[in-house]
């Protein structure tokens, strides 16, 4: 199993989205290398064209470049630890390389494409033989953590070139900061938001979820309550309905015949599911001891109770049933009232109808955490030419960013490009000339969520990454498919099993 498998679903989603993202070619849609469902129906729409705004120029070398006496410096760009090796993407990448080389005679940029399934082993071999590349990408957190500790701190290069980091939101910038420094610069980002179906709220007289962070929620009795997971539970139960029209709070409700669910968490990775309750990581400060953040333990128990006791969240068998999208994001069936998800779900949410909207992520213990995914290009510590590599990096993130974001279906991290992205979405039409997206989606909610990105990120490094993902998947499957478990015991067993795997990896 690939050690970045926690992001496999998202990467497969983003790769396959290229085919179905005839829907949103603004940045061609949304789904590029970080975690999404394995299979989702292809929207029946015709191809469209659009592009993000031209990138804001940043500091660039002054004066014309000349070829150094020894010839141009070779910089190798390695792909594809995630997205990037679809034929349509490769042609764009080769054009980007050609364009760069035509403008930079002092540097020869070489593109190395390795298919996703073999990329990790290939990069490991190259690094082991001291023949590694200079730049790797696009790569998400999971892919980069497979090579933890090998990424260059860009702080001095940013200062030296006066590279303008203010063009990105502070939350996005901080996302790439770690104990090792600024190990990345924002490129394509995927913030979280709450998708919801207004008609389901209207049907039973409920107010819609808040659209501004910090707002309270008005309950049916007029009381104002915090927008948190307790509120989500209450609303979720009222919005869960069986075939006889009873909701999950009523006597006679039949949990075996539910036709509409109230809430669906982002369950691609149980670390990510828990991150909505608080940022954290499984590795303690010493890098070798397993820790289960308190917020994560609470999140898993809340999720389990929501499936098996309160019945407002789908169990695994329901989630994987054909009636609820066969393991894909079930909100997109139009049978779920609310769902937390990343922005890449915009690609396929069209199947949920033409009247959905976006609300804010709820808080836990008074704090909002909106799980976050992001892709970028990184420079390896082993590069012999950091200055030249950084010049290439600036080009990929600057002049070439429009072409690459379009090819990778990425939402731009550069704030000046984000508004155009949503404008183009609103202009998309299906084969019959009807708008694909609802006319008044509150896209600002998605951008506002960036400031609440989970840091440390849920995909952060842990020992025995490969084996650990297997263990996490095993427990996730067990919890989703088995009622009556003692979750305190389950979480303790998970911790013990992870620790055993970590200890044996040294």
Model-derived regions, located:
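Ser/Thr-rich, Proline-interspersed low-complexity disordered segments
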Residues: 35-69
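Extracytoplasmic/periplasmic solute-binding protein
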Residues: 61, 179-188, 192, 220-289
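Extracytoplasmic/periplasmic substrate-recognition and gating elements
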Residues: 73, 102, 106-108, 180, ...
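Extracytoplasmic "Venus flytrap"/periplasmic binding protein-like
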Residues: 95-168, 182-184, 199-205, 209, ...
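Periplasmic solute-binding protein
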Residues: 146-149, 155, 172-217, 263-286, ...
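Glycine-centered hinge/linker elements that transmit conformational signals in sensory
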Residues: 233-237, 271-274, 285-321, 350-352, ...
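Long, aromatic- and glycine/proline-rich binding clefts that accommodate carbohydrate-like moieties
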Residues: 359, 407-478
